């Protein structure tokens, strides 16, 4: 009990002290204000009054604007017998704006089609199109309303003409193929009718040396001198032979044929008094030459020079010719 009494007494003392402290502050609030502070308070009140006035004016203007925005919808009768609000009609008139090129021919090529949206349904209006176009609508074609738009039709006509020409060409080709096949068939029949070529038989070609015996032969080159003004001329290259007759031992001749075509370029019969000489004064290789005096094909006197590849072969040829000359 004593403790509780002591606690209550302490609380009462603290409350008394607080009131003692608060009272002087309240007294300070009641002190008179300075003249400068009064002027500031008056100015603040005036500004607050002014701000409230324009706010009221703004609210009034907003309300007037809303009234102006509200459409004055009046019902108007249309030709179809339906009633439409006048505000909607005015809005539709406002939507019809000027389109660049709508009155020209070029503008019609793009198809002037307007879309009227009413109650969520989309309908196309044909106000600017003539009556004939509204009845029969043609598919849109770029440049159809222009003066040069007919160029596309010309191309179309050309394609049709081309298709016709192609058909004609195919028909002509078929005719050609048919005629060609007929020609081939006729040609095959002609070949069957033609007689077959005869088979050729091999025949023996006689050179005139069959009844002779070759004593000596060697490769050589032949030169001929018929006219001193013309000089020596080369007759050809081939094999020179010394042939002796099988029937008559005393008959011997010198035969030379050109290589390849086997043409006779030298044919001399060895007789009494036939002369053979060694060497050739006009050549640096005179030891490889031998010379013969005889008569040419025309019966005129001529001189022949025979050249071999080696000196030894030239000596052998010379010795055999000298021995074969009849005495």
Curated annotation (Swiss-Prot):
It is found in: Nucleus. GO terms for molecular function: GTPase activator activity. The modification Phosphoserine is found at residue 179. Disulfide bonds: none annotated. It comes from Saccharomyces cerevisiae (strain ATCC 204508 / S288c). Contains X-F-X-F-G repeats. The keyword Secreted does not apply. The modification Phosphothreonine is found at residue 31. Residues 1-96, 109-205 are annotated as: Disordered. Residues 24-83, 157-179, 189-205 have a biased composition (Basic and acidic residues). PANTHER family: RAN BINDING PROTEIN (PTHR23138), RAN-BINDING PROTEIN 3B-RELATED (PTHR23138:SF142). Its main location: nucleus. The lineage of its organism: Eukaryota, Fungi, Dikarya, Ascomycota, Saccharomycotina. Keywords: GTPase activation, Nucleus, Phosphoprotein, Protein transport, Transport. Present with 3620 molecules/cell in log phase SD medium. Residues 122-133 have a biased composition (Polar residues). It comes from the Eukaryota. GO terms for cellular component: cytosol; nucleus. Residues 191-327 form the RanBD1 domain. Residues 140-152 have a biased composition (Low complexity). One of its GO terms (biological process) is protein export from nucleus. PROSITE patterns: RANBD1. Interacts with GSP1, XPO1 and SRM1. Important for the export of protein containing nuclear export signal (NES) out of the nucleus. Stimulates the GTPase activity of GSP1. InterPro entries: PH-like_dom_sf, Ran_bind_dom, RanBP1-like. This is Ran-specific GTPase-activating protein 2.
